[in-house]
C-alpha cells in the first residue's frame, strides 16, 4: 500500500520514514502516540486518543478472517474453546476481540503471531489464534481448524466485511489540512499498488517474513481490495458494529466515536 510513496512513484509532499513492525507493536506505540501515521488494529482504535482513521489502507475480510487452530490429534470443538488456553497475537488485535465476541471469555496467552503455530504443535497451548499469512500457510497435516472468525462474523452479522486493520493519523501532531492531504496521497498510493500488484509485491517481499511470492500475492489479494482504496459506508458500518457488539457484551465500557478522513 505504501509502495508508490516509498519508491517515489508518486509525489507525496511529505518526508516519510517507513517503520516496519508487527501489528501489536504498532498498536502499543500508537497508545503512546509515538507515530504520526500508522497501521493499527481496528480494536486498538477504541483506546487511542487524538487519532483519526484514514479512509484508505484498511484491511477487511470478505467472509474470511483470522482462524483458530488446534493440533490435528487433539481437535477441539468450537463450543469448547472457551475452556481452553489459546495463544493470541496481542490483546489489542482485532482477531482477539473477534474471538472474545465469538466464544466469550477464555485464557489467552500473548505471543508473537509467528510463534503461535509452534506453540500449538508443542502443546504449550491448547489452540492458537492465527493471523496474517499463517491463515493460509499453516501445516494442515499437523493442525485442524477449530473456528473461522471470518465465517463466524458473516453468519452472525451478515452483509458487512470483517473489520481487521486500519491506518490512522495523529490529530495531535498533524493539522486537519495535513491529514486530509496525506489521506489523498495515501489513496493514490493504494490505487497505484492495486494497479501494479506484481511490482508492489516484489517490494513487499523484503518484509515478507520468509514467505514465497505466491503466498504473499495470495494474501495481498485477499485483504487488499476495493475497501482498501476507500472503506466507504460498509467499512464504517463494520467498524461501528464491532464496537457496538463489544459494548453490548461488556468487553468495552463506552461508545466509540469513529472519525474517518
Task: Describe the role of every protein-language-model region.
Residues 113-205:
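Pocket-lining segment of extracytoplasmic ligand-binding domains
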Residues 26-38, 49-59, 139:
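Short beta-strand-centered segments that line the small-molecule binding cleft or hinge
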Residues 175-245:
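Secondary-structure end/capping motifs
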Residues 1-21:
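Short, polar/charged alpha-helical segment
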Residues 22-24, 33-46, 112-113, 130-136:
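Beta->alpha turn/N-cap motifs
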Residues 245-261:
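Conserved C-terminal helix/tail region of periplasmic/extracytoplasmic solute-binding proteins
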Residues 55-76, 155-171:
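Hydrophobic/proline-rich hinge and linker segments of small-molecule sensing/allosteric domains
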Residues 1-7, 66-126, 132-133, 237-241:
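Bilobed "Venus flytrap"/periplasmic-binding protein-like clamshell domains
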